[in-house]
Design a protein with these regions (language model features):
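Extracellular glycan-modifying ectodomains
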Residues: 1-411
């Protein structure tokens, strides 16, 4: 009986929004008919396909209005979310979203074959040896996964994120590659997913990225004798928090809507100590070149607008992903030059790591197709340390191939 009532309510909402959409479209048609415009034009550009009563401009206007109203779709997505929540639905295989048992949303990760994992791991081994042949240090960083333990997904939903990452880490450790695994660090420190990740998105929070940059700095002090760790840079007392409550609807939340998922707070730690940073994204169009303090260099305020379906709030840091970034911090205590092979977790990680050292260059192999990582290393012998920092959802051929350029569409 409960499900029947919910279904009836849902259908009434559908009828209401459908009628409203139809009225808006009819008003547009009526307004258009009042205008003395030519009434017939071939929509397809051929003489045998004509729509009497409308020219192309009229048709396009109505089409856009239908799209705007039907695809004023956050209403429909939220309505569907209310319905799905009322029905007790905990996931959608086609849209790839799932409600974990801890109340957070996540997608599932496919199983990579042992052969694929071995190939990707050996690619990392070869890259480490190549970097070391140029006198550079190398570090592979396994970033955390939102699902920390088995049994978090709804019954019957498989996920292989941690299994895939374990397969790569096992080989790297057997080959004596320098590694650090944030999954283990978080487990040892009892840092739970609920406090460290967004509920509606797959990424970690900026506060977690700040902490992670400090852990990475400690590890770099072990890898590179010239790197000095500065604990004050991870001390929360040296940051003010810019609070944005109930602002962020993450990528997974957008699939089911805020009525189902809710929205996350988006809080940004901003250094209160002095720093002067130049942040560049060199490209032919829409290049970025900003110099100033941390906030001026890294924070894109347009992505902090309260428009959850259209704005990617996570991209408030560095305006999201880029093929290549170059950072120079003249105030940094370390004079080291880092090459960071990154995924989207470094949108927030890299700015905090940049507080520790003078130069960081990042390459995102999903977007960087200019040359291979090997070629980049050959051309930049001034690099001190090469870091590959990936979370388990980044295990793809495109991101684990360093000696040639991989275009995803050709895979």
């Amino acid at each position: 009986m409960r499900n029947r009532i919910i279904t009836v309510i849902f259908l009434c909402f559908l009828l209401f929004f459908g009628v409203r959409t139809g009225m808006n479209v009819w008003d547009s048609i009526s307004d258009t008919e009042k205008e003395n415009q030519p009434q017939t034009e071939a929509l397809s550009g051929t003489d045998d396909m004509k729509l009497s009563g409308f020219n192309r401009e009229t048709f396009d206007g109505i089409s856009n209005l239908v799209t705007l109203n039907l695809a004023n779709r956050n209403q429909w997505i939220n309505l569907n979310g209310i319905f799905q929540k009322g029905m007790g639905k905990t996931g959608d295989l086609e849209k790839d979203w799932y409600l974990l048992k801890n109340g957070m949303l996540m997608y599932s990760q496919n199983k990579d074959s042992d052969e694929e994992l071995k190939k990707y791991a050996n690619n990392v081994v070869n890259l480490s040896q190549f970097a070391e042949s140029y006198g550079m240090k190398f570090l592979y960083v396994e970033l955390p996964y939102k699902v920390q333990r088995d049994g978090e997904y709804p019954t019957g939903v498989p996920d292989y994120g941690n299994r895939n990452a374990d397969g790569i880490m096992e080989i790297l450790l057997s080959k004596s590659v320098q590694t650090m695994d944030f999954r283990d660090i978080m487990k040892d420190k009892n840092i739970e997913t609920e406090e460290s990740f967004f509920r509606t998105d797959q990424h970690w929070k900026p506060e977690t990225a700040l902490w992670a940059a400090g852990e990475l700095s400690k590890k770099l002090a072990q890898v590179d004798s010239e790197w000095k760790d500065y604990p004050e840079y991870r001390n929360s007392n040296n940051y003010r928090i810019e609070y944005h409550s109930n602002l962020f609807l993450g990528a997974i939340g957008k699939k089911i809507g805020s009525a189902y998922a809710g929205k996350d707070d988006f809080n940004m730690p901003i250094p209160i100590f002095e720093n002067t940073i130049r942040y560049r994204v060199p490209r032919q169009e829409d290049s970025i070149d900003r110099t100033g303090d941390f906030e001026t260099a890294f924070i894109e305020s347009n992505n902090l607008k309260n428009d959850p379906f259209k704005v990617n709030t996570y991209a408030a840091y560095c305006d999201g992903d880029h093929n290549k970034e170059q950072v120079t911090n003249e105030s940094a205590p370390n004079q080291r030059n880092i090459l960071l092979i990154r995924d989207s977790f470094s949108c927030t990680l890299m700015p905090y790591l940049a507080l520790y050292t003078k130069n960081i260059t990042t390459l995102d192999l999903r977007l960087y197709k200019t040359k291979t990582v090997y070629d980049y290393i050959r051309r930049h012998p001034d690099i001190d340390t090469v870091i590959v920092a990936y979370n388990p959802s980044s295990i793809t051929e495109e991101q684990y191939t360093f000696d040639r350029v991989v275009n995803e569409e050709n895979n």
